[in-house]
């Protein structure tokens, strides 16, 4: 619709609503993602893995399927390789039996069929573990972060930084410094309860130095108003070795070889799974389902070319 502006020239008002094509593509991607999660989660859970995130993107003529898995007690490259074989079998139709559907449907099936693969054509499968700095979304993420330094942004905008002492299904207890560290003086901390329902975003902080205080022991306050003297007994489960002698450097020996700066994950707290940023995963296995008879060596990540 044309209209005359103040300058006397005609202006054209254009619609800013999203196109149907964009909305349709997003809906189709969400449907494929949901179908992948529905198929993969039962098998991964049975094998002792948690499916943290799954996504599908396009890279030229191929699709890139990225699956993030974790498990209690930590995950190493061997475990990631096991998860990769399991995911590959499910996607290739070798282990789709949870819904009692018919045959595998052949290669490149559409997502709508119960027995067909949700991925059309050739694809690259990436199975990774979460990065150290991944967002804390589920209670299990908090339990696995016990002993780590986290930053929490509450729904009211207040930020809290502290070390996770313990976590349950409702919230976590943090040891929060009450004052800046002073040389020759013990650092005093208070125990603050963080309820998951009040959290807008929370993430583990990457620590390249020691997690301990270099100067003396650490005093922990029972709450914001009452201080416990050094050596006083803490509530059950709260004393996790905050002292200089008993704390463990979880990142000892890690070096930033590539010189890249760490970036905060911009995913919202409510995003399902809380996938880690690219490059931050501890271990990764990549499979290319579209080439023939090519093998790459194991150098921190495993590449395997497969014919689908």
From Swiss-Prot:
It is found in: Cytoplasm. It comes from the Bacteria. Residues 17-31 have a biased composition (Low complexity). One of its GO terms (biological process) is translation. SUPFAM superfamilies: YhbC-like, N-terminal domain. Residues 249-269 have a biased composition (Acidic residues). It holds the Pfam family RimP_N. Transmembrane segments: none annotated. Residues 99-113 have a biased composition (Gly residues). Residues 1-31, 94-113, 249-308 are annotated as: Disordered. InterPro entries: Ribosome_maturation_RimP, RimP_N, RimP_N_sf. Keywords: Cytoplasm, Ribosome biogenesis. HAMAP family: RimP. Belongs to the RimP family. Required for maturation of 30S ribosomal subunits. This is Ribosome maturation factor RimP. It comes from Parafrankia sp. (strain EAN1pec). The gene is rimP.
């Amino acid at each position: 619709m044309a209209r005359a502006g103040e300058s006397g020239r005609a202006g054209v008002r254009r619609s800013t609503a999203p196109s149907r094509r964009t909305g349709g593509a997003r809906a189709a991607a969400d449907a494929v993602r949901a179908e992948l999660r529905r198929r993969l989660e039962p098998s991964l859970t049975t094998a002792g893995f948690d499916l943290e995130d799954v996504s599908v993107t396009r890279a030229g003529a191929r699709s890139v399927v990225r699956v993030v898995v974790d498990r209690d007690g930590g995950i190493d490259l061997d475990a990631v390789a096991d998860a990769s074989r399991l995911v590959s079998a499910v996607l290739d139709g070798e282990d789709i039996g949870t819904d009692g559907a018919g045959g595998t449907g052949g290669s490149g099936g559409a997502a709508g069929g119960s027995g067909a693969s949700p991925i059309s054509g050739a694809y690259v499968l990436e199975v990774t573990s979460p990065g150290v700095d991944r967002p804390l979304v589920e209670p299990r993420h908090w339990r696995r972060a016990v002993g780590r330094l986290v930053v929490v942004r509450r729904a009211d905008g207040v930020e809290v930084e502290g070390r996770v002492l313990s976590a349950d299904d409702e919230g976590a207890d943090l040891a929060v410094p009450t004052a800046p560290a002073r040389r020759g003086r013990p650092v005093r901390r208070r125990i603050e309860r963080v309820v998951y329902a009040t959290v807008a975003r929370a993430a583990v902080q990457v620590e390249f130095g020691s997690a301990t205080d270099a100067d003396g022991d650490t005093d922990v306050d029972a709450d914001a108003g009452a201080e416990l003297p050094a050596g006083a007994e803490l509530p059950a489960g709260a004393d996790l070795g905050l002292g200089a002698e008993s704390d463990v450097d979880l990142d000892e020996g890690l070096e930033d070889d590539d010189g890249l700066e760490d970036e905060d994950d911009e995913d919202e707290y409510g995003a399902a799974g809380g996938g880690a940023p690219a490059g931050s995963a501890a271990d990764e296995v990549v499979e290319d389902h579209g080439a023939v008879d090519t093998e790459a060596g194991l150098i921190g990540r495993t590449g395997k070319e497969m014919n689908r």
